[in-house]
Amino acid sequence: MAGLKITETWVKAHLLRGARVLLAAECVKNLYPEVFKRLSEGRVAFTCCPEVENTTLLMGKLASIIRCSEPAEIVVASIEGSPHCLLLHMALNEALFDVGATERPVVRHYVVLEGQLIEVSEEAARVARYLHLVQKAIEKCPELLDELGRYSLEHKWASRRR
């Protein structure tokens, strides 16, 4: 069940050729081992912590893996609400863009919230990069802030200060 370190793996390694790949945040593996185990089944499992590892390097590594080994699938799993974990999703989207492959792998994005695995779209990670679009979503759907209050300690703290 131990995940390999993606930054320490050769992009042309035989195990990557046409493989189903998992890139999971270290916290997913450490805090939710059952989720990591389930996602790892039938996949080459890698772990990464973008708080510790350079995400620009990670993006380049993913682009090189896509270009050189043509994986069939890439799944990213991170901790919901973690600002640095969000970078894993962004790195994959950016790597796909940089490669510009017409024959791209199947891509899935997941977040883990309170032990539950939730699939999110590639677009969710893209929109998260554009705060003015997030602002529009809040204005159209202000109840998002009520839901945020159920999960975010920072939001609860900021709400009390207003």
Q: Which stretches of residues belong to each language-model region?
A:
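Iron-sulfur-associated redox domains of electron-transfer enzymes in respiratory
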Residues: 1-162
